[in-house]
Regions:
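Helix-rich C-terminal "cap"/substrate-channel and partner-interaction subdomain
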Residues: 1-91, 95-131
Length: 131
Protein backbone atom coordinates (compact mmCIF):
# COMPACT_ATOMS: atom_id res chain seq x y z
CA UNK A 1 0.00 0.00 0.00
CA UNK A 2 1.35 3.38 -1.07
CA UNK A 3 0.62 5.12 2.24
CA UNK A 4 2.75 2.64 4.20
CA UNK A 5 5.58 2.84 1.66
CA UNK A 6 5.57 6.65 1.86
CA UNK A 7 5.55 6.64 5.67
CA UNK A 8 8.35 4.06 5.80
CA UNK A 9 10.49 6.07 3.41
CA UNK A 10 9.82 9.46 5.03
CA UNK A 11 10.46 8.08 8.52
CA UNK A 12 14.04 7.31 7.43
CA UNK A 13 14.50 11.02 6.71
CA UNK A 14 12.74 12.61 9.68
CA UNK A 15 10.26 11.77 12.45
CA UNK A 16 6.77 11.08 11.11
CA UNK A 17 3.67 11.46 13.27
CA UNK A 18 0.02 10.92 12.42
CA UNK A 19 -1.91 14.16 11.96
CA UNK A 20 -5.29 13.69 13.64
CA UNK A 21 -6.61 16.88 11.96
CA UNK A 22 -5.73 15.75 8.42
CA UNK A 23 -8.34 16.65 5.81
CA UNK A 24 -7.99 14.46 2.70
CA UNK A 25 -9.85 17.00 0.57
CA UNK A 26 -7.67 19.82 -0.73
CA UNK A 27 -9.46 23.15 -0.52
CA UNK A 28 -7.97 25.33 -3.23
CA UNK A 29 -7.51 29.05 -3.06
CA UNK A 30 -10.56 31.26 -3.55
CA UNK A 31 -11.53 32.11 -7.15
CA UNK A 32 -13.12 35.56 -7.22
CA UNK A 33 -14.87 35.27 -10.58
CA UNK A 34 -16.84 32.25 -9.32
CA UNK A 35 -18.04 33.88 -6.08
CA UNK A 36 -21.26 35.62 -5.19
CA UNK A 37 -21.04 39.33 -4.40
CA UNK A 38 -21.63 38.63 -0.69
CA UNK A 39 -18.85 36.03 -0.47
CA UNK A 40 -16.52 38.30 -2.44
CA UNK A 41 -17.21 41.22 -0.08
CA UNK A 42 -16.50 39.02 2.95
CA UNK A 43 -13.22 37.84 1.45
CA UNK A 44 -12.15 41.40 0.62
CA UNK A 45 -12.90 42.48 4.21
CA UNK A 46 -10.68 39.63 5.45
CA UNK A 47 -7.88 40.42 2.98
CA UNK A 48 -7.98 43.67 0.97
CA UNK A 49 -5.59 42.21 -1.66
CA UNK A 50 -8.60 40.35 -3.07
CA UNK A 51 -10.18 43.73 -3.82
CA UNK A 52 -7.33 44.80 -6.11
CA UNK A 53 -8.21 43.49 -9.57
CA UNK A 54 -5.06 42.95 -11.63
CA UNK A 55 -6.59 41.27 -14.68
CA UNK A 56 -9.90 42.81 -15.70
CA UNK A 57 -10.55 40.32 -18.49
CA UNK A 58 -10.41 37.27 -16.18
CA UNK A 59 -11.26 39.07 -12.90
CA UNK A 60 -8.04 37.98 -11.19
CA UNK A 61 -7.07 39.79 -7.99
CA UNK A 62 -3.73 40.50 -6.39
CA UNK A 63 -4.74 38.15 -3.56
CA UNK A 64 -5.16 35.24 -5.98
CA UNK A 65 -1.73 35.90 -7.51
CA UNK A 66 -0.13 36.05 -4.06
CA UNK A 67 -1.87 32.77 -3.16
CA UNK A 68 -0.21 31.13 -6.17
CA UNK A 69 3.18 32.54 -5.16
CA UNK A 70 2.73 31.27 -1.58
CA UNK A 71 1.44 27.81 -2.53
CA UNK A 72 3.33 24.67 -1.46
CA UNK A 73 4.51 24.36 -5.06
CA UNK A 74 5.17 28.01 -5.93
CA UNK A 75 5.12 29.41 -9.46
CA UNK A 76 7.61 32.31 -9.56
CA UNK A 77 7.26 33.06 -13.30
CA UNK A 78 4.72 35.07 -15.26
CA UNK A 79 3.64 32.02 -17.28
CA UNK A 80 3.40 29.93 -14.10
CA UNK A 81 1.04 32.47 -12.58
CA UNK A 82 -0.87 32.65 -15.87
CA UNK A 83 -1.41 28.88 -15.91
CA UNK A 84 -2.31 28.69 -12.23
CA UNK A 85 -4.56 31.74 -11.80
CA UNK A 86 -5.36 32.92 -15.39
CA UNK A 87 -4.23 36.56 -15.59
CA UNK A 88 -3.39 37.17 -19.23
CA UNK A 89 -5.79 34.50 -20.53
CA UNK A 90 -8.52 36.94 -21.50
CA UNK A 91 -9.17 39.20 -24.44
CA UNK A 92 -6.08 41.37 -24.06
CA UNK A 93 -3.77 38.34 -23.67
CA UNK A 94 -1.87 40.07 -20.88
CA UNK A 95 -1.43 43.41 -22.62
CA UNK A 96 -2.69 45.24 -19.54
CA UNK A 97 -1.98 42.88 -16.65
CA UNK A 98 1.39 41.28 -17.49
CA UNK A 99 3.40 44.29 -16.25
CA UNK A 100 1.38 44.28 -13.02
CA UNK A 101 1.86 40.53 -12.55
CA UNK A 102 5.61 40.98 -13.13
CA UNK A 103 5.69 43.75 -10.52
CA UNK A 104 3.80 41.63 -7.96
CA UNK A 105 6.22 38.72 -8.49
CA UNK A 106 9.23 41.04 -8.08
CA UNK A 107 7.80 42.53 -4.88
CA UNK A 108 6.95 39.11 -3.46
CA UNK A 109 10.37 37.63 -4.27
CA UNK A 110 12.05 40.88 -3.17
CA UNK A 111 14.06 41.03 -6.38
CA UNK A 112 14.49 43.55 -9.21
CA UNK A 113 12.13 43.35 -12.19
CA UNK A 114 15.05 42.20 -14.34
CA UNK A 115 15.19 38.92 -12.40
CA UNK A 116 11.53 37.98 -12.99
CA UNK A 117 11.24 35.49 -15.85
CA UNK A 118 8.45 34.73 -18.30
CA UNK A 119 8.66 30.93 -18.21
CA UNK A 120 12.22 29.77 -17.54
CA UNK A 121 15.63 31.11 -16.60
CA UNK A 122 16.33 31.90 -20.26
CA UNK A 123 13.01 33.73 -20.86
CA UNK A 124 14.01 37.27 -19.88
CA UNK A 125 11.26 39.90 -19.75
CA UNK A 126 13.32 43.03 -19.07
CA UNK A 127 17.04 43.67 -19.31
CA UNK A 128 17.11 46.93 -17.39
CA UNK A 129 15.51 50.30 -16.82
CA UNK A 130 15.28 52.75 -19.70
CA UNK A 131 14.74 55.85 -17.59
Amino acid sequence: DIEKMAVDYLSTLKPVEKNENYDPIRHGPPILREMSDERRATLIRQNPDYGIIICRCEEVSKGEILDALRSPIPVPTVDGIKKRVRPGMGRCQGGFCSPLVTQIIAEYLDCPLEEVRKSSEQAVITYGKTK
